[in-house]
Structure formats: structure tokens, C-alpha cells
Amino acid sequence: MALSFTEKKRIRKNFGRIPEAIEMPNLIEVQRESYEAFLQMNTPREQRTDDGLGGVFKSVFPITDFSERATLEYVSYEFEQPKFDVEECVQRDLTFQAPLKVRLQLVVFDVDEDTGARSVKEVKEQECYLGDIPLMTDKGTFVINGTERVIVSQMHRSPGVFFDHDKGKTHASGKLLFAARIIPYRGSWLDFEFDAKDVLNIRIDRKRKLPATTMLYALGYDTEQILDQFYTRSIYRLDKKGWITSFRADAWKGVKPEFELIDAKTGKSVAEAGKKITALKAKRMAEAGTDEILVTSEALIGKFLARDVVNLETGEIFGEAGDALEEPIIAEMREYGIDSIEVLDIDAGGRGPWLRNTLKADKNETRFEALSDIYRVMRPGEPPTQEAADALFGQLFFDPERYDLSAVGRVKMNMRLSVAVREYESAADNMRTLRNEDIIGVMKVILDLKDGKGEVDDIDNLGNRRVRSVGELMENNYRIGLVRMERAIKERMGAVDIDTVMPHDLINAKPVVAAVREFFGSSQLSQFMDQTNPLSEITHKRRLSALGPGGLTRERAGFEVRDVHPTHYGRICPIETPEGPNIGLINSLATHARVNKYGFIESPYRRVKDAKLTEEVVYLSAMEESIYSIAQANATVNDKGELVNEFVNARVAGEATMIAKEEVQYMDVSPKQVVSVAASLIPFLENDDANRALMGSNMQRQAVPLVKSEAPFVGTGMEAVVARDSRAAIVARRAGVVEQVDAMRIVVRATEDLEGSKSGVDIYRLAKFRRSNQNSCINQRPIAKVGDVVSKNDIIADGPSTDLGELALGRNVLVAFMPWNGYNFEDSILISERIVRDDVFTSIHIEEFEVAARDTKLGPEEITRDIPNVGEEALRNLDEAGIVAVGAEVKAGDILVGKVTPKGESPMTPEEKLLRAIFGEKASDVRDTSLRVPPGDAGTVVDVRIFNRHGIDKDQRALQIEREQIEKLQEDKEDEQSILERNTYSRLRDILIGKDAATGPKGFKAGKIAEAALEELTQRQWWEIELKSEKAQAELQALREQFDASIRELEARFNDKVEKVQRGDDLPPGVMKVVKVFLAVKRKLQPGDKMAGRHGNKGVISKINPLEDMPFLEDGTPVDIVLNPLGVPSRMNVGQILETHTGWACRGLGNIIDKALEEFHQKHDVAALKASLTHAYGDKQEMPETDAEIIELAGNLRGGVPIATPVFDGAREEDINDLLTRAGLDTSGQVRLFDGRTGVAFTRPVTVGYKYLLKLHHLVDEKIHARSTGPYSLVTQQPLGGKAQFGGQRFGEMEVWALEAYGAAYTLQEMLTVKSDDTAGRAKVYESIVRGDDSFEAGIPESFNVLIKEMRSLGLNVELLEDRGGAIEEEEAPVAAE
């Protein structure tokens, strides 16, 4: 395995012992594959399957009008190219989407008046536009109105049949009442349930219950057929001695006969009355030759007839099928001479009389009665007719339009009802509605359950829950839109002259477009992407939610649904889930898990044959897995791949046991297949308590990208995978050589995959200081240098939170575990001044401000520098167009964009009249509505974007921005063209040299072409040479055509982009111009910021200590951070201590390499440098080949040697000790520390080491807030609450008690009146302060008036009376001014 481009630069030493059986899959495949299966965009039209979009069209079309004179049929669909690419959509607040064109045929028929026969009159085919469909970006996200969104996959109950019981809660006796439910993908639910009287009932759509046999009558069975379906029969013949019946051993085993059984042949007693016949005894009786037994007439009493018994002469019925036999009936039958009767085998062989009891409780006896009953339940109040009842019943379960089990539901049904089938494929068939056999099968299973056979289903088993991913969710919403459209089409077909219209006249795409827009815009599963860092993006795309439409609600979800289930193993992470009300309802997919075509989550396993591992990897779902025994990934295996130990830890049907090695059928592929991506990034996860591991995985997602990313010393080996799959770093699309690099772009000349149609140049534009959804900063930096050779999928540029192609969420810092003057009490963190000074945890945040100039009733708003009553100082950062300059440093209250709004004519004040009289001009009639920096914000302007409406002249600033964009495009085009030309001409030279030329340009000699001859011509003239060899000439011609085509395509692409830059923007109605300003804010670490490790150890910074006061090591190095040791034992996250020790060793090894590198710079001995690397890594590690690469590697390792300790397979204690010894450090991991203030050593050694810490998104700068004067609520006139509203702090009930307790009456009075909601009092206080007078009078608070109004609305006339006895005049509350 050769080292990749980035691995050569920094090798991570891996402590894992278990080899990985398969590559880590692409982590966002779930999203991409699902949506591609829905669109089938890259599949040729002929090869498209009936899933996804095509399936939706086929299910809704053909649409026939009411008179059946015409049908609209679906042929195929195509996508056109999207109008704007992803980048342009983000900038212009558009949706990244492609137009959908559907080819439809309108078939018009001639209908014969007399016979009603139809013949085709004409067929009109046409392509119709059916709206735009949002496309997924290659990152697995959607750009909707300029923001990136993710569609989260939903877990829901799989369609199919489920059996359950009430756990004995319904009935007082604690008797189990069994129930079954058939759940379709869409359509009516059918429930079967036993009531307390042991009668089996059905419910349709949870309506009133009916006896289950009503359903069977409605299906067309009669009483005898129903009994035959569920019971076997025995025939009793009358003999001189009694009744004789055949003896079947299986029917009698476990039965206690009430009468003794006598062998009919021998006349001997073979079984006593009241004694249980065991299975063994029944078998022996059969073996002894007992094949018929004799019973008396009493033994028949209480048995049930299987057939009607009728007097054939008179037609008199002695007994109906299902009736119990009684003595008079038996006597009558003997009298009439009936000498054989058929009875049901009830209680024999363990079949209970439940269905026969249900039949007797059912009042219906014919199909029409049963159908009428069902009709009355479904449509109460309507009289049933034969046709209506028949039609309704057919629609409920047998009409594919209204009832769809789906492929999954059919597979699940077949698997549950037939015991033998365990594989999905063998259970699949195409019947999507119910069959009679299904309903009878379900009833048989529920009767078996009642008889104590079989098990009920576990709804939380992952075999019974499935995942709906993006594609399926979109498909369901699209179907809803199409069905709405179908109604409109049917109506329109009736209203127009069908002979003259074309398909597009009938189609109105609005309902479809609206359904799609609604799904992406407001569905609970369409979420604003968490873009804090690359890990949070990946985790968001791999999330599984049980909430959402058709799912659970937080309130209703019980404990069982949220709990970890044995089938989660290798499918859903048992660790990563939110804390709080959503715990267990929102989960994350495990690292290796994938979703199969039926929506079930599968986990990979290696096949084991005869205790030997094979290379074959099989994906199993929870259902399929239940019948195998599966060993763990850490089972000991020798070099030949054979299991060593006689007994192995394994899981059998979800239970952990020990089994013999020969019984093992499968084995886990990797120890980390159990956990999710976030949890697999926690080193020493196996040493952390689960609760803290949960916090650790959640907090990594909140880590803010720092100005300087640094990969962790102690990682798990997953860092590179996350960086690659999140697309935060830039990955090379194909192999090539780096031609040009600057901060903005990388140009690579491709060396493979050179097809005629593709350009031979890859240009990668880097994202510079872009704003993410969470206002963190997205900035990419190139790693590759000019001349570097890169392979496909190599990382050539780092993104936010990545370092040399590895995920880097935080920084490695020197930590000491010791108390320090109470500054680390209760998880507080003491940090050194160095951390702030060296910008270790500084991050950049980018905020976006937007201002729109609208066309108002009074006239258009204007963006301008000319703002009334604003001094020159406030305008210093604005250009002549009134827009802030890029690079300006602004603080709260500064103007970013000057804007004025016309205000209505107002009566002139005397002062204005005076001004008019003196200056003769009208005072300005506009007011200042400029965009200002909000309170609490400050920063540097990094970007300004201006959007103009079509047909409005652009200002200077907009034209300048446009010029810059076009220059960038021009530069890209020129570079691509020059590399194309270089490549083409070098290939042309190879074709020409040494060949025979027939003719050439002027002055060129025919004959063999030498290199010198070519040098004399210009490269353009080379094309004019004609070769004698036809083959060579054809090759030359092909090259020429390919080159011309590439140049044409390049020109077209460039012109298209330029045209997009130059044309106006689509702005909302009434908006003339929009200006967006982006502000970069540098946030340094400060007290109040939240920090955390990867083990759930979180805290808030309490103090920034001067460098000289920090505890220091013997060599004088002060520690960076002091943590409280009491935070470890009770939390049980010991992983952080192991990480600290290991990090300490990594740094020690780095110091050794650093010394070796300094020696190398003096002596230039590469061998010695190599030896120091081998000392650090051990001799098994593969190293780069060239000296330059070795030197670069050593340079990158000076800070510390990174190691990987994979989860559940990480470094052991002896590994850490060995690492510490190599680094020349004490294996205790503790050192003597000295007090920075006194210089005296602390009394005992302290644990010191390097630990990876993250700065979380909860920044004190974004939380702290203070209000001066601000907005008031309209009704209560109290200040608003919250930072967003610039609100105040509530002075609540308890605070009032505190002031009452102090006796501070006046303070309390002003708190509750003038400082809050006494409007008149507020104004008076302001006036008195202006006058310099400090007395004031409190009035009546507005909330008191609100209270009185509310009481009056309840009909209580409350008046406020003065002491003197007269009513106080209520002041009318003044209307709140703007």
C-alpha cells in the first residue's frame, strides 16, 4: 500500500492490531445513491427502472377524461442542464435545480354511439415542461434559495404485518389480548384483535370493530369453507359398540381424554380417562398398531360439527356446521339412521375454539350482509346497496390505485406468514395489494399465538423499522403533487375541445412545483445544514430521525422506542444521539452500515467457513442476521486466517455467548463498525463512560474552525476519511501535474483519463473566507506546490478544520491536572496568556448583512452617500455610491450602506418655516434608513455584493465588482487554453517527427520531418503539414478536431459565465437593488467561552492567567491549561488521561526528531535523520523514498509524532509505556511542576501532557448583551426580551421579593413603573433628567390597564377608586410611537 500525497508529508503511527477487511465506504453515499435512484438522471432513457420518478409518472398516468374519449399517456422524461451552477445559486439566493421535460401522448378516441366500441382517432405527442426539480450537489446537500439544506433520512415502521399483545393491561385478570395489524405503504390499515370474550374482531382504519368472520364472508367464503380453512376434521362412524374414529398420534399428544380410549380392533383400553397422553405414549400407541379407537356417545357431547347435518327427505336440519353436539341431537341422528358425522378437531392438537366462537357471534351469514356491515362502518348514515358495498370493499384492499403494500410490505408479509423464508429475494413477488391468502394467513398466525404457539413481533427490532431516504421522501411528495395535478387535468379535459388541444394545454405544473417547494422549504425533515465544521456536515447527512411526517412525536414516544436494541449492532450508533427531549429518536448511522433497496439497514460481515476466514464480505440486515452466529472482530486469528481459540465470543440471535469455533458462520469486519463517525473519532473510546462518550461525540460537532488548524497528536485513523468525504478539503478529480498555485486556485494538467470530449486541464477554485450556515469561516489553503505529481483522490488543498488532509477540530495544548486557587472549581478552565497571544484558539466568524432598496408608495428608496443629519466622520468608510469599502474596520453603529427612504409630507414646524424663508429650499423630505452594524458587533468588511434589477443602471461599485469577476473568468480561460495548446502541440510534435511529409507550408521541404525543421515554423503552421501515411494523417486530423472542439467548448463556457455576470438579477417584486455586506469578526479566546475535549469533558474559561504565574516544567516551559483533576473520577472518562499521557509521548518523540533535524542542517546526514524517524515509528513503518520527502516529513513531525489508536482496538497500556520510554520520558506520565508565582516546586508530581481541546460554538461574545433604550411590546408596553430583539432583563417575581425583603420601596416602585411600562411616567422622567431635576412621579403601569381590560372581557366591571371616594379617571393609553 503506497503512501498517498498527504501521508508522505505526515505519517500517522497506527496502533490497531486488527486488519481492516474492507475499505471505509464513502460516508455520504446514503444521500447520493438514494437521490440518484430517484432521478435516474445519468441512466440512459431505455435502461431506467420503474423506481423513482419514472415509477411515479407510471402510477399516475395514463389519465382518462370522464367521458373516456381521450387519455393522456406518459412516454418518458428528460432533464435539461441547470441554468446556474451551485456557486452562482449560493451567491444569488437561488435554488440549484434543473428543468424537467416530460414527453406525453394525448390519444383521442372515436366512440361508436351504438356499440360503445372505441377506436383510436389520433395521437398527439409533445414535450411538456413540468417545473424544476432541485438537484443534489456532490456534497449530498441541496441549495434552496441560496442556503444549503440537508434532507434527513427518516426511520419509520416498515409496511407489512405485525403481531402484538396488550401485555395484559386491558383486562383486569391480566389476560393477554393478541392483536395483528396489516400496515400498507399507503391505504387503509386492517387490525385483528381478540376481545375479553375471546372473540376475534377486525377494525378497518381503527373504526368500529366487526367479527373477523365478517371479513371472510365478504371475501366470498361460506361457513363450511371458513371452518375448513382453520380446522382439520375427524369422521366418527357408528358401530354396535359405539362411535369409531381413526387414531392420529399427532392429534392426541398432550391431550387429557375425558373418557377412556379403547382400541377398536382388540377392544382393549389403550388410554385411561383424565390421564395426559404424552408424545411418547401417542407414538407407542401408533407403533403398537392402534389405528382406530372406540368412544361412547358421551365422548361426542361438546364436540362441534364440521358440516351441516340434514334430513334429506324433509330438509330438516339437525345441526349446522359449527354447532355443538348435544345428547338430543345425537339421539335424533341415530333415530334417522345417520351413521357417520364429521366433527372439528378443536382442543385436539392444541387448536382452540376461538374462530368457531367468532362465527357463532357473527350475525351475518351471507356475503351481502357482511359487505353491508363493512359499508355501514366505513360510511355511517348511508344506506348500502349491493354495488356500492361491493365497490367500497374492493377499493379498500384490492385496488392498486388506493392500496399499496409496496415491495417492502409484500416481502415482509411473505416472510412473516411463511416460516421457511429468511431471505429478502426469495420472499419477493409483485403483488402489491392484499390476497385472500394473506388475510387467512394473518388470522391463522394470530390464532396460533392465542393457542400459545409462536412469538409476537418486536416493533423496535430493526427488521421491522426501515429508512426512508431523500429519494423516497421526494418521491412521495412528488406523487402528491402529481395526483393534485391529475384532478385538474381531468376537469380541463372535460372543459375543452379535445380534438384541437395539445398535451401542454392540459398540463398545469403549479401543483407539482408547489409540492416540491413545500417539501424542501418547510418539511420537518428538510433541515438547515449544520455547517459548523466538516464533521457536523457529515453527521447531519448520516442522521436518522424517527420524527417527521408519518413518524413519531416527541411526546408520544415511550422509553422502548428510544432505547438501544440488540439489532442496532453495526447499524445504528448506540452512543451518538442528542441529550434532551429527542434522545434516542434521532440517531446516527454506524460507520460501515448501508441502506439496502428495501430501506433496511445492513451491516457487513466476513464469511467464515470451517473456522477459517474467507475474503467474502456479505451485508446482512437485522432479519437475515438473526439466524446466524457472528464472531467479534477481535477474535484471535493466525496468519492463515484460522480462528485460534476453541471457543469464541459471538452473537447468536442478538445474545452474546461463547460458541465453538466451528459453529461460527460470520465475523465482524471491523471493531468500529458498531459506532458512528463522530464516536469513531474519540481515541480510547473504550475507556470512557457511555454518557460522557455521548457528550464527546456531540460536542465535536460544535467545534469552531480555528485560524490555524492542527491535527490531533492522538487520533483514531478516521480523521483523513472524514476530511475527504465531507468535501471540506479539495480532492484531485484525476491524476496530473500541478502547473500553477496561488491562494485562489490550483491548476492541474491532467495526465490520465484524457478523452477527446474532456478538457485536459483541471482548475480548482479555492473558497476564500466564505460564510457558512453557522457564520463560521470557510477558507481553503493549497497544500500542493508547482511541479507536484498528484494521483486521483489525493488531497491538494486544506479546508476549514483540516490539516494536511486530516480533520483538525481543535489544537494540541500542554495540560496539567491540578487545582489552582479555585479557578478550576466545577469544571472551570484556567488558561495561559500565551494561548490568547499566539492566537491558538482564535477563530474568524463571518456575518452577512443585507439591505434592499424598494419602490415604496411615496417613491423609490435610494442607496446613496447623501444621508440627512449625518456627519462626514460617520461616512468615512463609504464610497461615492454609499457602500462601505472592502477592508474597512467597522464597529457597532457604523453605517455599512447608506440608504434614504422618502417620507410623507408633514406639516412644517416654525423652525422649518424660518429655514425655508432664509435659504428658500425645502428641508430634505427623506429619512435615514441606512444599514448599520448591530450592537455588540465589530469587524472587517471582507466582501460586498450588489444585485440590480433587470433594466436598472448599475452604479460605479457594481460595475467594478463585475469587472473583477470577469477578469477572474478571463484568467481561468487563458490558463486552460495555454495548457491545452501546450499539451496538443507536444502530442502533434510526437505525431510529426520522423514521419514522411507530402506537402507543407511555404518554404517547407517534403520528406522526413526533423525536429529542427519544425522549430523554424510557428506552431500554428504545423497543422498545414500533410503526411504521406494515411493513418498518421488521420491521427493528425483527429487531434486537430479534438483541439478545435475543446477551444470552442471553452469559449462557449466562458461567454455563458460572462453573460450571467453581466445580466441583471431576479429580485423579489418591489425590490430595485440589494446590497450584501460580509463582515469578518476575529474572536479571541476569553473568559466565558466554552471549551471541551473529545471525551465529554467540557468547561468554561474562568481566567486568563499571565504567563509568569502559570505552573512551569523543570525546563521552564509554562503549561497552557490547568484542569481540575476532580473532573475525572466521578465522570469515569479515563480516556482523557490516557490521551494526555500518549500526547506527552508524541511530543517527546517530536522533540527527538527536531534535534535530529537541526543536526542534519549542520551535517547533512540523511541516514541519521532516517534513523531518528525509525526510532519514533518502529521499523515496520513504510517511509517515503526520496530524501526531499524524508526532510519534509521530519519537518512536519517536529511538533509531535501523530499516532492513531482506533476505537476498541487501540493502544494498550504497554504500548503507551513503550512510547513514553522511546521519548525518554517517565512512564508514570507525571513530572515535577513549579509554582509560577513563588518558583517553589509543588509537593507532589503532577500529570502533565498534550491533550486535544476544542473551542465550541457557544461563544460569550454572541451571548452577552446589554440594553439601553430599546423597543417595547405594543400591548403591555414592557421592554421586549432576548438579544435578538435588543430586549431587557425581566425583573421577575423573585426579584420583587428580594427588594421587598430589603424594604427598598422606592427602588421597587421605579422598577415596576417608570423603568418598565408606565408610558407617561417614562416620558416625565426623561424630561426631568434633561432639566437636571431628579424628582419624579410614578403613574399607573400599562400592565395594570391590561389586567383591568382582561377582567372586563370576562364580564367583571373593575374600577380603580381613589381614597377620596371618587373614581379615578382612566387615562387613555397613548398609542405607541414608532
Swiss-Prot record:
Entry's Gene Ontology cellular component terms: DNA-directed RNA polymerase complex
Protein name listed in UniProt: DNA-directed RNA polymerase subunit beta
HAMAP family documented for this protein: RNApol_bact_RpoB (MF_01321)
Subunit comment: The RNAP catalytic core consists of 2 alpha, 1 beta, 1 beta' and 1 omega subunit. When a sigma factor is associated with the core the holoenzyme is formed, which can initiate transcription.
Provenance organism: Hyphomonas neptunium (strain ATCC 15444)
One GO term (biological process): DNA-templated transcription
Cited function: DNA-dependent RNA polymerase catalyzes the transcription of DNA into RNA using the four ribonucleoside triphosphates as substrates.
Keywords: DNA-directed RNA polymerase, Nucleotidyltransferase, Transcription, Transferase
Highest rank taxon of the organism: Bacteria
Catalytic activity: RNA(n) + a ribonucleoside 5'-triphosphate = RNA(n+1) + diphosphate
UniProt family annotation: Belongs to the RNA polymerase beta chain family.
EC class of the enzyme, as a word: transferase
Enzyme Commission numbers on file: 2.7.7.6
GO molecular function: DNA binding; DNA-directed RNA polymerase activity; ribonucleoside binding
Keyword DNA-binding in annotation: no
